[in-house]
């Protein structure tokens, strides 16, 4: 890796330590990875190696397709989506994953519970 080196076990432990949900979808729209831990959005193991669109509710699927298509055609690099779930604020951010030559490699979805931030702004 360009910024140093670590074992696969170290990388996996680091990703599982972060207080966010991470999902990686490859350039063929296939779920390839999600970190472990508590989840706001359920990610069953059977979702791995399946098309990402089959994992979203029908009303959300067009948005997901549009986001991924915008990454593939280089019109966007990230898309933030704010939502409330279970009475808490969440930020779901989709990022285009590109190589050094700007080729699209996939999409990473990051889900972050923003309740901690909200508490800093309430009096």
Q: Positions of the model-derived regions?
A:
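A short beta-strand signature within small-molecule sensing/ligand-binding domains used
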Residues: 88-95
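PAS-family sensory domains
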Residues: 2-69, 122-123
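Short acidic-hydrophobic surface loop/beta-edge motif
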Residues: 79-85, 97
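Hydrophobic beta-strand positions
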Residues: 24, 96-97
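Sensory coupling linkers of modular signal transduction proteins
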Residues: 98-123
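PAS/PAS-like sensory domains
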Residues: 71-80, 90
